[in-house]
Amino acid sequence: MAEKPQLVNNLPEDVETDECMNKYTHIYSPDLLSDQVAFITGGGSGIGFRIAEVLMRHGCDTVIASRNLEKISQAAKKLTSTTGRRCLPIAMDVRQPETILAAVDETLKTFGRVDILINNAAGNFLCPATSLSFNAFKTVMEIDTMGTFNTSKVIYDKWFKDHGGSIVNISATLGYRGQALQVHAGSAKAANDAMTRHLAVEWGPSGVRVNTVAPGPISGTEGYRRLGGSHAETAGAFHSIPLQRAGNKTEMAHAVLFLASRASSYVTGSVLVADGGAWLTSANDVERLLGIVSSRSAKL
């Protein structure tokens, strides 16, 4: 049974779990993305799942690509059942270009086009730099940064170069001021922000727009759980955020929808920060973050 959506203080509906909403209020025309196709990495859960749902509720068919075929196949069934649009699950590893080539070929064979690319696949965890292994740092860079470039390049070469399109990268604000315990993810996301600008310049003449959404703390996500969101909420840390709360997944999906659609037709090379103002005011509390890491280690 679907979880009851939350609608508080005019916030958009959302559910904490990786389930579709049983009610959705459109803020754009329901046919905004009519008959377009979106390719979404990491689309089987969290923000990626909600992005897929919201795009599909605006007339878009989707491809959700991830390493876990069983998980994304279940997600695809939910998305199609709720929205009535097609959703193709494809097993793919963003670190392996040959799997991306095969996935894009299957997408073009099935749908005949790709209009939107959402680079959402990512990996993150809290870890002091002194405890971070060489392999752990490398893995995050490979998934977040190399994965974004690999997927963007394949889709550009196979479709966007001749037909145009919109790329939206999912980033973070970690690198804006040097977030404690996040040298791996902060470095990867900073590289992605630079990549957004470079590709916007190079691919603009082909009719390709490249933009980024940088979320803050978003409830109902694996990142929220891994990065101490519940602990921060309990400790009252969100009071330092200008909007006094965490965001929800639908709010992030709406930011992506704006950048992916013709609503932002003259926007490229931009980073849209969707964090309630958190990075402007939140304390970079090293002791609190280290406390979260220590408490988790003690439970293992």
Swiss-Prot record:
Lineage: Eukaryota, Metazoa, Chordata, Craniata, Vertebrata
PANTHER family: PEROXISOMAL 2,4-DIENOYL-COA REDUCTASE, PEROXISOMAL 2,4-DIENOYL-COA REDUCTASE [(3E)-ENOYL-COA-PRODUCING]
Gene3D superfamilies: NAD(P)-binding Rossmann-like Domain
Keywords, alphabetical: Fatty acid metabolism, Lipid metabolism, NADP, Oxidoreductase, Peroxisome
BP term (GO), one: fatty acid metabolic process
Catalytic reaction(s) noted: a (2E,4Z)-dienoyl-CoA + NADPH + H(+) = a 4,5-saturated-(3E)-enoyl-CoA + NADP(+); a (2E,4E)-dienoyl-CoA + NADPH + H(+) = a 4,5-saturated-(3E)-enoyl-CoA + NADP(+); (2E,4E)-hexadienoyl-CoA + NADPH + H(+) = (3E)-hexenoyl-CoA + NADP(+); (2E,4E)-decadienoyl-CoA + NADPH + H(+) = (3E)-decenoyl-CoA + NADP(+)
Subunit structure: Monomer, dimer and oligomer.
Example of a GO MF term: 2,4-dienoyl-CoA reductase (NADPH) activity
Residues binding NADP(+), per UniProt: 42-47, 67-71, 93, 189, 215-221
Statement: the UniProt record of this protein carries the keyword NADP: yes
Subcellular location(s) of the protein: Peroxisome
Family note: Belongs to the short-chain dehydrogenases/reductases (SDR) family. 2,4-dienoyl-CoA reductase subfamily.
Residue interval(s) of motif Microbody targeting signal: 298-300
GO CC field: peroxisome
Role description: Auxiliary enzyme of beta-oxidation. Participates in the degradation of unsaturated fatty enoyl-CoA esters having double bonds in both even- and odd-numbered positions in peroxisome. Catalyzes the NADP-dependent reduction of 2,4-dienoyl-CoA to yield trans-3-enoyl-CoA.
The protein's name: Peroxisomal 2,4-dienoyl-CoA reductase [(3E)-enoyl-CoA-producing]
Enzyme class: oxidoreductase
Organism listed in the record: Danio rerio
Residues binding substrate: R67, R95, F125, S133, F134, N135, R226
Assigned EC number: 1.3.1.124
Top-level division of the source organism's lineage: Eukaryota
